[in-house]
Each structure stands twice: as C-alpha cells, then as structure tokens.
Amino acid sequence: MPWVETTSPHFAARHELVDDDDVAGVLELLEGTRERLAEAFATIPGEVEVVVHGSDAALAAAQPYLPVLRRMVAPAARRYLVGWFGAGSIHVLAPRVLIAHASNVAGSREMNLLAPAALYAQLVVGVNNPRLPPPFGPARFARYVRWAWLQAGAAQWFSGQTGHARAAIARRLREGPEPDFPPGVRDAHLLGGTVFDLLAREEGEAACVHLACDLPSGGADEALRRAFHGRPLRHTESTWRSHLARTASAHP
C-alpha cells in the first residue's frame, strides 16, 4: 500500500492512501487541540510529524516502547494504548483501526478517536516539563512509567478523553483490585485523567497546567499536596475515590 503525505498549518501526516479522507479529520482534530493548548501552556511544539499506522504490528515495530507499556497496564486500559509520542512526532493507529479497537460500551469509540489529541497533549506536557519525555531512552521511559498518571492523565483531561471514560472506569473498578492513589502505571492511562478532573473542579484549569509542568523533588505526594493547596494527601485520596465512584456510576 503506497504512503502519501497530508499537511495542515502545523502538522505533516504520513499515511496509507486508503486513510486519506480520515487523516484530514485527524489533522483538523490536532489543529483544534493545538489551538486550545496554546492558550493554556507556555510552549507549544512547532511543526509536528504525524505517522498514521494501518496495523498494530506496524505501530509496535516503529515504537518498541509501546508493547512494553501495554504489558504493564490493566486490561480495561489496554485497548486505549493506540499510539506513541516522541520529539516532534506522534505515531497513532489509523481511525479505521482505532474504531476496530473500541469496545461496544459507551464512550470507547470516542476515547480512541481522541487518541491523536491525547498523544499531542502528552508531547506538549513533555515540552513544558523538562524532566519528562520526550526524548525517550531507558531512563526517561522509567521516569515516564513512574509519572504516567501525571503526563498521560493531563493528556486525557486536556484532550477530552476523560469525559468519555465512564464505562471503561466502571469496568476497571469491577474487574481489578482497588487502584492506587495516584494511579500506578497499571491504571494511569485510564484513571490518571480523573485526578486532573478533580483538580479542575476544585482549583481550575491553571492548577492542572501547573501540576503537569512541575515535578517537585518530593515526588507525587508533594506534587499533589501543592496542587490541592496543602491538603493532607489522605483527604485528597478520599475525595478522589469518591469522585471516581461517582464518575463510574453516572448515567451516560
């Protein structure tokens, strides 16, 4: 299948010819996401390369950290690991494959189709937080795993994925042990966004940006205490668990 290139003002996509029409929609989504994030974050990447893959095998071959991460996450989140980001680039499955990956529960299709926006948001967080990737290497990947709740969680919230995650969150709470707070890598790519959703409700979007852009020396505990105005971590954890339960039980 021949590869072609489609461009927009700030993105250049390489993809199979069969995905030509769908990629135009991906670039439109990315331009809208860029415009929104430019209002919130101090720095936005220049032109970003978007590589749209027609199969899981092609994506995994191009981005070998992704299969490693998939083995670490809970089954409820695995279907949403559909791409990767690097310095000046994002790799993602084609929309037709994203739809095939989705389950039949409410919101699953929408979450996967927002994956390009979430990957771009992870790139933006990394550009604004020098201690987070990109670039990736063994040490940076290990740090990403430790802070996935923050980088991936911020991306879920800023891209709009969290608003569609109710059914997937409910499945995760039914099927596995109680999640950690903040969520470990097993749950970060599904539940991380709920931490930012809670913070946005209590402190506003600016607090979410600040949390995403700063890694204090005291680790996650210090980051969360500062974000929630010094509130003891156990109180924030209790509030988050209540928020998680409400999210999972809310009507679509």
Short names for language-model regions:
Residues V18-A76, L113, V124-V127:
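Zn2+-dependent metallopeptidase catalytic core
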Residues E178-P252:
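Pan-zinc metallopeptidase signature
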Residues P75-A167:
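Zinc-dependent metallopeptidase catalytic helix centered on the HExxH motif
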Residues L17-E31, A106-A115, V145, W149, ...:
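Soluble non-cytosolic domains of exported or imported proteins
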Residues R34-F41, L119-Y120, V124-L132, F158-G163, ...:
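Sec/Tat-exported extracytoplasmic proteins
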Residues L27-R34, A121, A152, Q156, ...:
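Extracytoplasmic/secreted envelope proteins and their assembly/folding machinery
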